[in-house]
């Protein structure tokens, strides 16, 4: 499938991207930072009024890394496009610095080749069709936090109640896929730590 790549277990690689939601009357521009685990398809999304390296790092710090820590795992690498919110001088760029501090490898999509991050593109399309189009028909949002509350409800349902046909999901929910592969991920991480100690 186009946009798919090899991933070994939950936490092995996540994909992150920015999704421009639009301009809301009385609110202004709304951007979504999106993260999806490329193995289990567990997703996270947080809304902002701008797209910057700080907002990109905030999603990881506020939602993504605490989730992995809660399950005794680490995020090993992340795939992004080459947008300015993700790429810059590693010594001064807040997102690049955050990844370095958290020891997360950073892979970038090929230039002018967004389909290499196709997993997150498909996720955005699903969100647009199943959440945003419906939400904006039903309600006028006065604040980003109001929209975030409804998005969080949808995200919980997506992760915990909706069967997924992803490569490793086999019709299970993303969260069930994540939990089922949890032991594999922990064994892989322990094995990599042991190998690193032997090589040191």
Give the ranges of each region predicted by the language model.
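Mobile-element integrase/transposase regions
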Residues: 1-36, 42, 58, 197-200
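Short small-residue beta-strand/loop micro-motif enriched in glycine and branched aliphatics
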Residues: 42-46, 107-109, 133
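Hydrophobic beta-strand scaffold residues
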Residues: 75, 105-106
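Buried hydrophobic side chains on well-structured beta-strands
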Residues: 41, 78-80
């Amino acid at each position: 499938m186009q946009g798919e790549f090899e991933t070994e277990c939950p936490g092995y690689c996540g994909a992150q991207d920015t999704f421009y939601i639009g301009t809301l009357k009385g609110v202004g521009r709304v951007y979504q930072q999106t993260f999806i685990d490329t193995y289990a398809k567990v997703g996270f999304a947080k809304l902002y009024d701008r797209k910057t390296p700080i907002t990109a790092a905030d999603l990881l710090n506020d939602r993504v890394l605490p989730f992995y820590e809660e399950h005794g795992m680490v995020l090993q690498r992340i795939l992004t496009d080459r947008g300015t919110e993700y790429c810059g001088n590693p010594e001064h760029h807040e997102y690049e610095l955050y990844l370095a501090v958290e020891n997360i490898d950073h892979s970038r999509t090929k230039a002018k080749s967004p389909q290499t991050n196709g997993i997150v593109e498909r996720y955005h399309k699903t969100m647009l069709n199943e959440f945003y189009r419906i939400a904006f028909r039903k309600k006028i949002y006065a604040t980003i936090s109001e929209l975030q509350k409804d998005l969080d409800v949808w995200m919980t349902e997506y992760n915990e109640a909706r069967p997924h046909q992803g490569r490793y999901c086999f019709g299970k929910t993303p969260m069930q896929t994540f939990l089922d592969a949890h032991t594999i991920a922990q064994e892989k991480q322990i094995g990599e730590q042991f190998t690193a100690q032997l090589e040191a």
